[in-house]
From Swiss-Prot:
Spans annotated as SYT11 binding 2: 257-293
Binding site for Zn(2+) 3: 332, 337, 352, 360
Biological source species: Rattus norvegicus (Rat)
Biological process, per Gene Ontology: adult locomotory behavior; aggresome assembly; autophagy of mitochondrion; cellular response to hydrogen sulfide; cellular response to L-glutamate; cellular response to L-glutamine; cellular response to manganese ion; cellular response to oxidative stress
Region listing for TRIAD supradomain, in residue ranges: 234-465
Name of the protein in its database record: E3 ubiquitin-protein ligase parkin
Active-site annotation: 431
Region of interest: Necessary for PINK1-dependent localization to mitochondria: 77-237
Binding site for Zn(2+) 6: 446, 449, 457, 461
PROSITE patterns linked to this entry: TRIAD (PS51873), UBIQUITIN_2 (PS50053)
EC class name: transferase
């Protein structure tokens, strides 16, 4: 396979590697090509420095992945905490916790909350993939943490890849001080920091971005993350068709209703045909949960890219028209025109201005939308609801399509009481080191043994699955 190496952030070149090629071997190839000592090279990928003993497969490097290699002398601080503080001291047995790459982070617990503590953002499937990756290429995990809309060449929802770059030099040479734990860490600027490894760059600000995971991408290829779309790890039936599909979209209502992407597409098109999208002053043109739950408008409007190019263009047009109407304007009623106009308040005679080739020149009545006339309007009809295509949801299906109900069942199966205060605590992946969230307790204990955390637990089964 081929990986692309960017050396000192200046230029890139391809390097042929195997899945079992070590990072040190990759350094040796680059060092020979560049005429520099291999021990001065540092390999940066997805927000962390890759250690010499790791292999290409262990690091989740895929065909035509881009890695950054910088020439920088080793420092004493690097020996203990080279990758941003995620690596603890060696255990008595010598086991070392490698800092977790962005390729293994899962933020769905932020959108799909549970009562977890500790490393709640790492799902059980992610922990399994750690051990599976070491067994060979045939065990490569199929679980996808992120989904994006790829505008090209895919033109559809695809698994995504989370990446990070330095906010100063805009190179992907920044190692994170700690990994993101929620979507806000990724989507809100200036929340996360690290250390840029590029020579002469003092940058510490992390900037996250996403790429389509279905095809090789260049440095500049980015895609928008769809944070409501997730793997249907709990096998929740779709609220509309009641089938168990994957992936699914989870609305941000209290019940976290689940809908498959095909039914979400139909829901959007139906509401679009009826012009029943909601115009929100802050969010824009959006839709609530299909069950009509309050306070559930979709905030990330790129989810409507699922409509496809033609319908999405119509969505944008209707959104712009709705904005004009909200401002007190009118739309030209002549077929094929529909220009947005802002006549004076109380002005009955409206002319679709023909300036700049935007208007058609049609003169119409503001009240009845017919050709302009003197006197009373002959007839006025309510446009809304005349041809409404009702999109109804079965109440029983709505009750079964709740992500939170499945979450409660999961919690029952995955919780253990704190050994000191008996408060139930859920383990949602990650290590065996638990901490009671109760302020009066805060006991650190071992999930495996059920006793207070000690050095024996640390050395014996800290990271057992």
């Amino acid at each position: 396979m081929i990986v692309f190496v960017r050396f000192n952030s200046s230029y890139g070149f391809p390097v042929e590697v195997d899945s079992d090629t070590s990072i040190f071997q990759l350094k040796e190839v680059v060092a020979k090509r560049q005429g520099v000592p291999a021990d001065q090279l540092r390999v940066i990928f997805a927000g962390k420095e890759l250690q010499n003993h790791l292999t290409v497969q262990n690091c989740d490097l895929e065909q035509q992945s881009i890695v950054h290699i910088v020439q920088r002398p080793q420092r004493k601080s690097h020996e203990t905490n080279a990758s941003g503080g995620d690596k603890p001291q060696s255990t008595p047995e010598g086991s070392i916790w490698e800092p977790r790459s962005l390729t293994r982070v899962d933020l769905s617990s932020h959108i799909l909350p549970a009562d977890s503590v500790g490393l709640a953002v790492i799902l059980d499937t992610d922990s399994k993939s750690d051990s599976e990756a070491a067994r060979g290429p045939e065990a490569k995990p199929t679980y996808h943490s992120f989904f994006v809309y790829c505008k090209g060449p895919c033109h559809k929802v695809q698994p995504g890849k989370l990446r990070v770059q330095c906010g100063t030099c805009r190179q992907a040479t920044l190692t994170l001080a700690q990994g993101p734990s929620c979507w806000d860490d990724v989507l809100i600027p200036n929340r996360m920091s690290g250390e840029c490894q590029s020579p002469d760059c003092p940058g510490t600000r992390a900037e996250f971005f996403f790429k389509c995971g279905a095809h090789p991408t260049s440095d500049k290829d980015t895609s928008v993350a769809l944070n409501l779309i997730t793997n249907n790890s709990r096998s929740i039936p779709c609220i509309a068709c009641t089938d168990v599909r994957n992936p699914v979209l989870v609305f941000q209502c209290n019940h976290r209703h689940v809908i498959c992407l095909d039914c979400f597409h139909l829901y959007c098109v139906t509401r679009l045909n009826d012009r029943q999208f909601v115009h929100d002053a802050q969010l824009g043109y959006s839709l609530p949960c299909v069950a009509g739950c309050p306070n559930s408008l979709i905030k990330e409007l790129h989810h409507f890219r699922i409509l496809g190019e033609e319908q999405y263009n119509r969505y944008q047009q209707y959104g712009a028209e709705e904005c004009v109407l909200q401002m007190g304007g009118v739309l030209c009623p002549r077929p094929g025109c529909g220009a947005g106009l802002l006549p004076e308040q109380g002005q009955k005679k409206v002319t679709c201005e023909g300036g700049n080739g935007l208007g058609c020149g049609f003169v119409f009545c503001r009240d009845c939308k017919e050709a302009y006339h003197e006197g009373e309007c002959d007839s006025m009809f309510e446009a809304s609801g005349a041809t409404s295509q009702a999109y109804r949801v079965d109440q029983r299906a709505a009750e079964q399509a709740r992500w939170e109900e499945a979450s409660k069942e999961t919690i029952k199966k995955t919780t253990k009481p704190c050994p000191r205060c008996n408060v139930p605590i859920e383990k949602n992946g990650g290590c065996m080191h638990m901490k009671c969230p109760q302020p009066q307790c805060k006991l650190e204990w071992c999930w495996n043994c059920g006793c207070e955390w000690n050095r024996a637990c640390m050395g014996d089964h800290w990271f057992d699955v």
